[in-house]
């Protein structure tokens, strides 16, 4: 068994390594505008839409598990068990938790008022804000991309994600899997 020291990278890229094709700069406003239009039309806000997108995001991880593990191995030299435990399983657990609690999170919550405001009533109504940008780092490129995307989707927002260019195989794989499972106008990906 050979070892690898990250401080002294190998002179050749690992097998399966992909060169990242960056999104042309001129295409970025189109991706953001599509996400903004999806949000403005209200397609991201209903409970059913949020659950459907969370299920699709979960399917990215479940259906693409082998591809993601291979990409993590190629870019970061993560053993499969580490990639599964730290990037995939944890994120599936996060999404499952969000799906379990989403209906309750969406309900307005009554809150107490100070005596000076009586006989008034108050409640907290959680509303989405629009388009969320998720920029993922290289060290946990799946977990720190999909987890925040899931949170933004659960909140009812459209999302634009940018995987780390320092993990190009993972970035390309995530882009392909997300495009396969989620509507591009609600969840856009920018590479580079």
Set out the residue ranges of the language-model regions.
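N-terminal Rossmann-like NAD(P)+-binding subdomain of aldehyde/semialdehyde dehydrogenases
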Residues: 2-123
